Amino acid sequence: QIAGMIGAALGMADAGLEDGWSGRIVYFAVPAEEYVEIDYRLGLVRAGKTSFLAGKPELVKLGAFDDIDMAIMIHTGSADSLEGAAGVSASSNGFLAKTARFLGKAAHAGVAPEQGINALNAATLALSAIHAQRETFRDQDCVRVHPILTKAGDIVNIVPAEVRMETYVRARTAEAMLDAAAKVDRALHGAAIASGCTVEVETVPGFLPLANDA
């Protein structure tokens, strides 16, 4: 994205168009564009250091866009969906983010594993349960769910008592996004119950689906 912005600035400068402008153009790099490191950024929000998890809404809140009349965003895209060096995408998926914290019971994995409750087993079962939902996602809804484990235990000879997961739930429409999110929640809670663990699930609003109609 930064390279595209710089390229646009250089192109405007080379074309010598500045004399004909009645306003000004701002080449505006926005940090923290992606919703990543969700637990860390939620910590910043809870500490009062930020209000949002991504750069654009935070900058809107801070007034950085107050004197901007029109904004054009550039983003990298798939070569399959664009023709030439640049193009206008028909739509972009919306998404919401989820964090899951599985809580079990620590025990010595070699001496007394039966005394533990394995939170990693709950998390891996949840991953399988999420995967089992994929055939229920309609192709036209473009649903994408891609969880990761951000903490899977502490040391190898202790039954994991805490495991953390983050995931996006993406879809072409808000309805499909909420439907997929409900299935993910069901997988997370069902896996925890099956494993004897508890799970804390937090859902964080992301961005709404975007449909370019002009």
What are these regions (language model features)?
Residues Q1, A112-G116, M177:
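Alpha-helix N-cap/helix-initiation motif
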Residues Q1-M12:
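Di-metal (Zn2+ and/or Mg2+/Mn2+) metal-binding site signature of metallo-dependent hydrolases
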Residues A3, T50, A182-K183:
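Residue-level recognition of alpha-helix initiation/capping sites
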Residues A3-G4, S22, M177, A214:
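Bulky hydrophobic/aromatic packing residues
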Residues I6, D19-H146, G153-I158:
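Histidine/acidic-residue-rich, glycine-tolerant segments that coordinate divalent metal ions
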Residues L10, P57, R186, G190:
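Surface-exposed charge patches
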Residues T124-A214:
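Metal-dependent amide/peptide-bond hydrolase catalytic core
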